[in-house]
Amino acid sequence: MVDTLACNTPSFTKLNLVSFAHLRQFEVADCSFVYVKEVRMIGLKWLESVVIGENCFTMKDSRSQLHLKDCERLRELRIGNHSFEYNPSWVIVNLPSLEEIEVGEWRENDYRSESALIVKSKRLIMRLTTRPAQLEIVVVR
């Protein structure tokens, strides 16, 4: 687990987890990686869970990217409020075991929850495109 307020050095702008071949869980506490504008989790065949706290990966840059691809055992993806908020490109592809995606926090009868996304399914096939922010999430099974 990455602690709260960790990895916030301005020169640390890319996070590539490809070399962590046996990573099973990636968990980040709140307010971490604030200067990172590119995240790559590709080909991590043992990865089962990605949980990101609030206000992480908040760098404002039109070239920011999140790549989550080819992780055959990944079951859950949870991203806290305001994390990746300014990240215009999300590529989430080829995750055959994915059962749950949660982005933001949804509270019943709370108007601030309108930006939350929660998808739970045994068989998840989804394409979501939100053009104003040019956010794209693609999960193909």
Give the location of each predicted region.
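Acidic/polar low-complexity surface segments
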Residues: 52-67, 105-120
